[in-house]
Amino acid sequence: MSNLENLQSQILADIAAAADEAALEAVRVGALGKKGSISALLATLGKMDPEQRKTEGAAINRAKEAVTDALTARRDVLKAAALDAKLAAETIDVTLPMREPAAEQGRLHPLSQVWDELTAIFADMGFSIAEGPDIETDDYNFTKLNFPEGHPAREMHDTFYFNPKEDGSRLLLRTHTSPVQVRTMLSQRPPIRVICPGRTYRSDSDQTHTPMFHQVEGLVIDKGSHLGHLKWILHEFCKAFFEVDNVNMRFRPSFFPFTEPSLEVDIQCRRGKDEIRFGEGEDWLEILGCGMVHPNVLTACGLDPDEYQGFAWGMGIDRIAMLKYGMSDLRQLFEADVRWLNHYGFKPLDIPTLAGGLSS
């Protein structure tokens, strides 16, 4: 048995001397592998008589167990040492500033800023936010909004359609956030007062149009809602958003399938060489469309038009952002140009509030 004891002592010494996991694995293979020294001893047991096999087998198994335990313990030590070395090499000095100088700090995108400004203004008037899916059905996007069959907006050149289903119906990318109004009227009972911001999609691309753009719509449904309420809300919104004490507005008759009467809204402005100033001047600029919700839309959403009436409006978030902050090309909003963002962006922690100033 002295040979077995010597072998065990040598293997344990090799384990203790292993400097890394690769060296330790080599020791394991040399001892316990298919052709290892202890494995070779176990293979000789079959040639022994029963009494000798019992004695020798127990001794060899004790040696194997001792080697296995030593391997496990040494592996744990080596793993802990490797982790400590890695952590030491990757030490972060938490007293150092997290960012580079202010010129290289990230900036909040103007669309995110304007989105927050809209939310602050309408929240102050008691509106909540309603959201819905970008992928819509024809029923929610057109039919329930009083778009007749054959309306140009239903054509492929204006709307992104998915491939038809087996029943012939097709999903589409919503062309406006009005389907959110439909979903709200179907799921809530009046009074309703919501704004519906989100992404919308139309097959169009030029200096003032992109295939994907952002829109915000507002909806009020109640028993006594009328155009006077609508005009007041829009007037207060324009004063707050453009940060002027007063602004003249012009309401022109128009047509939208989902409102009756329908109106387009212009605001007074002065056009300069590099900017547009609101609340003064002799020019007019269209900013949004609005109107009283069409009785057919109320009926399609399960509301009695003899009991309830309401009004709605919609505007492009991208467009009003360009008007307020002097951006000339809509496509630049989506080009991810860091130089452009550093010029037009906002500090991330400057949260817009009516009390503190929207864009201060």
Swiss-Prot record:
EC number in record: 6.1.1.20
Binding site residues for Mg(2+): 260
UniProt xrefs under Pfam families: Phe_tRNA-synt_N, tRNA-synt_2d
Keywords, alphabetical: Aminoacyl-tRNA synthetase, ATP-binding, Cytoplasm, Ligase, Magnesium, Metal-binding, Nucleotide-binding, Protein biosynthesis
Cofactor(s) the protein requires to work: Mg(2+)
Tree of life domain: Bacteria
One GO MF term attached to the UniProt entry: tRNA binding
The protein's enzyme class: ligase
CDD domains according to UniProt: PheRS_alpha_core
Chemical reaction(s) catalysed: tRNA(Phe) + L-phenylalanine + ATP = L-phenylalanyl-tRNA(Phe) + AMP + diphosphate + H(+)
Keyword hit for Nucleotide-binding: yes
Magnesium recorded as keyword: yes
Record's cofactor remark: Binds 2 magnesium ions per tetramer.
Protein's cellular compartments: Cytoplasm
Cellular component terms (Gene Ontology): cytoplasm
Disulfide-linked positions: none
Family: Belongs to the class-II aminoacyl-tRNA synthetase family. Phe-tRNA synthetase alpha subunit type 1 subfamily.
Subunit-structure text: Tetramer of two alpha and two beta subunits.
NCBIfam families xrefs: pheS (TIGR00468)
Alphabetical list of HAMAP family matching this protein: Phe_tRNA_synth_alpha1 (MF_00281)
Entry protein name: Phenylalanine--tRNA ligase alpha subunit
Species name: Rhodopseudomonas palustris (strain TIE-1)
Gene from which this protein is expressed: pheS
